Amino acid sequence: MPRHQDPLIGLTTYGRNADNRFTLPAEYIDAVRRAGGIPVLIPPGESHWKAVVETLDALILTGGGDIDPGRYGGRRHETNYGIDLERDALEIELARWVMDSGLPTLGICRGAQVLNVTRGGKLIEHIPDEVGERILHRAPPREPIAHGIRLKAGSRLARIFGREEFEAASWHHQALRGVAEGFEAVGHAPDGTIEAIELTSHPWLIAVQWHPELTAASDPLQQKLFDAIVEEARRGS
């Protein structure tokens, strides 16, 4: 049985900004509310994170700045931005916990990268350097752009969306360099960049490199991802 009739959905937030405020784009919160969930924000530096997540019915690891390359044996790049060691530390702890506990989890953009890095995976530090720019994954200087996604037939994501091909909002300059042990790549961009992964041993752990929250208010297809995690939370996975 689920813990709550209206599921509590944890969302990680950005680190402190110049005004000493923790923030999170409203699109994440709105998408969870539309799905019938109650958003619970988890900011970096939360020392009692375990007490918080033990009350949750699901967790969303949100997008944001780059992960410290030291976490995956990478190197600093001139395009790195938003590196936040406090946020890295919290989200990697959360990722370990949800992978062990079975809590329904959705990773979005940075969240997908956190999950991969937590299990020993690596990242491409800057997509144009290695993959090229046949497909843009963000518009200059750092704005969202749309491109195609192709999902693996029969994957959990393909079942959620009810189709295997669609356009999605992209906003990243880094990507997964292969998948960590236990993950399966189930979505790709036309240039071969990994766009979605699932943890095969987990009851419900999905991560996407694109940003479904950006268009979910006007695109029912992207809202389905939030509907799906809230529904899974209701079932008490």
Place the predicted regions along the sequence by residue.
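Catalytic cores of DNA base-excision repair glycosylases
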Residues: 161-167
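Active-site-proximal beta-strand elements of phosphoester/diester hydrolases
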Residues: 206-209
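The feature captures the ABC ATPase H-loop/switch
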Residues: 112
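N-terminal beta1-alpha1 cap of cysteine-dependent amidohydrolase-like domains
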Residues: 1-108, 116-118, 124, 128-160, ...
